[in-house]
Amino acid sequence: MERAVMISIRPEWVQKILDGKKTLEVRKSRPKLETPFKCYIYCTKPKRKYEDYIVTEWDDCFDWPNEGFFGGGLVVGEFVCDVILPIQIECSSPAALEAGIEVPGTCLTDREILEYLGNGKQGFGWHISNLQIYDTPKPINSFTCIREGIDGTGWWPMDRAPQSWGYVITEGDDADESRRNA
């Protein structure tokens, strides 16, 4: 049985990934998997109406919401994480952060990464490759995750998205068989 990762990403960052602008996802932790591994993109639910509107065609941005409405609360695609890079921002001078230098591939400035990770703390840049966008987004319960239960540890249908990321069984694996053998 091969593991993959379900990663929760806010709508505005999913849009940048789908546009090809964001090729490095910054996280505080990383999975205990050898690269390359598959990641499923869960687009989180929006905080405001229409915040999860993701443009799939240029013309859609002038006529929303419509058929191009795509997003929150669903798995919208997948990618292969082929490299995980260590990321660490250290700053002793606030003036150095004022320039707001963007870290390549992240769509984030060094200041934003510093605020997210903390001064001198290491994070990880998950490199996005082989991006596939689903024609029809998938519900979270169509994926299977590992969970502790009354009957012990086993693989079960997901009923909620992970806070950051979590392990799932890749599509094509027999989830029912693994539940019986867990």
Give each language-model segment a name.
Residues 1-182:
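Structured alpha/beta reader/binder surfaces that contact nucleic acids or chromatin modification marks
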